[in-house]
A protein has these predicted regions:
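Conserved SAM-binding strand-loop segment of SAM-dependent methyltransferases
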Residues: 91-96
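Pocket-flanking alpha-helical
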Residues: 56-58, 79-81, 98-99, 119-124, ...
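N-terminal Rossmann-like NAD(P) cofactor-binding module of classical short-chain dehydrogenase/reductase
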Residues: 109-110
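Predominantly a Rossmann-like dinucleotide-binding segment in NAD(P)-dependent oxidoreductases
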Residues: 50-54, 154-244
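N-terminal secretory signal peptides and thylakoid transit peptides that target proteins
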Residues: 1-20
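Beta-strand-loop-alpha-helix segment that lines the small-molecule cofactor/substrate pocket
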Residues: 114, 119-167, 183
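N-terminal Rossmann-like dinucleotide-binding module
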Residues: 18-87, 165-168
């Protein structure tokens, strides 16, 4: 057995013992840190799927611990830019994420696509034998989240959601979870949360999609609509069809 396989086995054993921490950064990154110490031929390889601002940032963090060998996005300009900046132009570029999942040399993928694509890519990645880091919000619906949870259990893959607040900030959130689960504040009767509002505007000007963007695929399972730049890239977050 090579050292990378041994490192992964060690991580999975630790994850099973630590419960919730197994899906948080505090447990996930020690696995990658072990692999990062290996000789270049033994280092893990990963593919970055969705490499806009946040997706590129996640990939940049992961490449300190593993080698980025695939860059995937529906915008070819992003592919070229991130390939050059993070891989020195040596990674393979793809517009079709399924081509990334077909590669046997890739151990895990980072997913930083628009939110409405998360579920499909994450599930297919695990079914293809890949571990997954997926940005928040993970899904648009509770049912999609249940599907991902089901496939995670079925495949036994390592799955981390990029909700950094839960694993950082001095472990305050994990401490709060422990206090609640131990019953130290009694039975929770009510939970109150607040959601900020997004910007408003429109009507927006329609236009032909830029040549560098595969707009029809970008829409995915969402309603088919004409291209307007205010729906795409960073601003997708303000549309319920694509984000929460």
């Amino acid at each position: 057995m090579n050292k990378s396989a041994l490192s992964r086995r060690r991580f999975l054993n630790q994850s099973a013992q630590t419960g919730i921490a197994g899906i948080l950064a505090s447990s996930y990154f020690p696995y990658l840190a072990d692999a990062a110490k290996e000789a270049p031929s033994e280092r893990l390889r990963f593919g970055a799927i969705g490499v806009g601002g946040r997706g590129a940032g996640v990939a940049n963090g992961a490449r300190r611990l593993a080698d980025i060998v695939a860059v995937c996005d529906l915008d070819t300009q992003r592919i070229d830019r991130v390939n050059k900046s993070l891989a020195g132009g040596k990674a393979k570029g793809y517009q079709d994420y399924r081509k990334v999942l077909e590669r046997k040399d890739i151990a895990f993928v980072t997913i930083g696509t628009t939110d409405h694509w998360h579920t499909r890519i994450a599930i297919q990645a695990m079914q293809a034998g890949k571990d997954v880091y997926c940005e928040k919000p993970l899904t648009l619906t509770i049912e999609e989240g249940k599907q991902i949870s089901k496939v995670t259990k079925e495949t036994g893959r390592v799955f981390q959601v990029g909700t950094q607040q839960r694993s950082e900030m001095g472990q305050k959130f994990l401490t709060a979870i422990g206090i609640i689960r131990e019953g130290r504040i009694g039975k929770i009767q009510k939970v109150t949360c607040n959601i900020g509002g997004g910007p408003k505007g429109g009507p927006f000007k329609k236009s032909d999609p830029p040549a560098n963007i595969d707009w029809n695929t970008w829409l995915g399972q969402a309603p088919k609509v004409d291209y307007i730049k205010e729906r795409c890239h960073y601003q997708f977050r303000w549309w319920y069809e694509y984000s929460g």
